[in-house]
C-alpha cells in the first residue's frame, strides 16, 4: 500500500498495488481496492511548516487545520448532495458546484469510500484525531508508527482502529521516545484480544523482512506475559493489513 508523504496535515490519496510486471502503473492497481487518505499529526507538519514561518507550527495548530479542512469538506459535500438530489430538469436550471480535487478526496472520506491512514506517534494526539473523526463523522482505519499506541490500546480497539507499528524502532526524534517493545502485543490483546495490530515498515530493507519483524514483536509479547500463538502473530502481517487496506474479502487469510 503506497501512501504519499507525512509532512502535510492531509497528504493525499494512497493506493494498493500488486508487485507484478506491468507496462503501466494503473495496471498494477489491486482490483477493486479502495483508495486511502494519508494524514499526519505531530512533529512533522509543525516542524516543516513552522520552519517556513507558516501555520501550522504547533500541535494545536495542527488540530485547527484538520477541523478547518473538514468543515470545508462538509460544506462541499452538502452542495454536491443538494445538486444531485435535483431532478434532471432542475439540474439544467441550477448552478452545478465547481469541482475541487482536494474536496473530492475529503468528501470521499465523509461518504465512507476512502480509508484514512493517519501518521501519528503520541497517545494524546491519536486520541485527539479520534475526537476529530467523531466530530465530523468519518472513520480512521489505522494509525501508523504509533509508538505510544500501547497507552490507548483499549481506545483503539473500541473504535475498531488498527495500529500499523514498528517492532522495535524508536528514539529517533522526540515524539518517538516513549516506546515499549511489547507495543504490538499490547495493541493486539486489547479488550481481550479484540485489537488490530499490524507489523509495518516504511524502510526499503525492513519491508522485506516482515516475518522477522513479527517474530521480534511476538517474542516481546511473550516476555511481557501475553499468551499469543504464532498463528495469531501471522495475522499481523497478513489478514490485519488486508483489512486496513480494504481488501480482506480478496486476500490476507
Predicted segment positions?
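Distinct, well-ordered alpha-helical segments
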Residues: 126-134, 152-157, 214
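Short acidic loop-to-helix transition motifs that present clustered carboxylates
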Residues: 123-125, 146-151, 239-242
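Generic beta-strand/beta-sheet core signal
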Residues: 3, 119-121, 143-146, 164-168, ...
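Short acidic active-site motifs
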Residues: 105, 125, 151-152, 183
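Short secondary-structure boundary/capping elements
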Residues: 97-101, 121-124, 148, 175-179, ...
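Polyanionic/metal-chelating signatures
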Residues: 1-142, 248
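His/Asp/Glu-enriched, well-ordered alpha-helical/loop segment
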Residues: 115, 154-157, 161-253
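Positions that flank functional sites
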Residues: 7-8, 148, 171, 205
Amino acid at each position: 500500500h503506497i501512501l504519499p508523504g507525512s509532512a502535510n496535515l492531509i497528504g493525499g490519496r494512497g493506493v494498493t498495488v500488486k508487485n507484478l510486471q506491468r507496462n503501466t502503473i494503473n495496471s498494477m492497481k489491486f482490483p477493486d481496492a479502495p483508495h486511502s487518505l494519508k494524514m499526519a499529526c505531530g512533529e512533522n507538519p509543525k516542524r516543516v511548516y513552522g520552519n517556513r514561518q507558516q501555520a501550522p507550527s504547533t500541535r494545536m495548530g495542527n488540530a485547527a487545520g484538520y477541523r478547518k479542512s473538514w468543515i470545508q469538506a462538509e460544506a462541499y459535500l452538502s452542495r454536491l448532495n443538494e445538486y444531485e438530489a435535483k431532478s434532471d430538469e432542475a439540474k439544467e436550471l441550477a448552478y452545478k458546484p465547481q469541482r475541487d480535487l482536494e474536496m473530492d478526496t475529503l468528501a470521499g472520506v465523509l461518504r465512507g469510500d476512502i480509508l484514512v491512514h493517519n501518521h501519528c506517534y503520541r497517545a494524546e494526539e491519536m486520541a485527539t484525531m479520534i475526537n476529530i473523526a467523531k466530530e465530523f463523522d468519518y472513520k480512521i482505519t489505522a494509525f501508523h508508527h504509533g509508538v505510544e499506541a500501547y497507552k490507548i490500546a483499549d481506545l483503539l480497539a473500541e473504535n475498531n482502529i488498527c495500529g500499523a507499528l514498528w517492532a522495535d524502532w524508536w528514539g529517533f526524534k522526540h515524539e518517538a521516545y516513549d516506546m515499549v517493545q511489547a507495543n504490538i502485543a499490547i495493541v493486539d490483546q486489547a479488550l481481550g484480544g479484540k485489537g488490530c495490530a499490524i507489523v509495518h515498515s516504511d524502510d526499503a530493507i525492513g519491508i522485506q523482512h516482515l516475518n522477522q519483524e513479527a517474530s521480534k514483536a511476538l517474542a516481546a509479547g511473550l516476555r511481557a506475559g501475553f499468551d499469543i500463538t504464532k498463528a495469531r502473530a501471522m495475522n499481523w502481517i497478513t489478514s490485519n493489513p488486508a483489512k486496513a487496506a480494504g481488501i480482506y474479502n480478496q486476500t490476507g487469510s
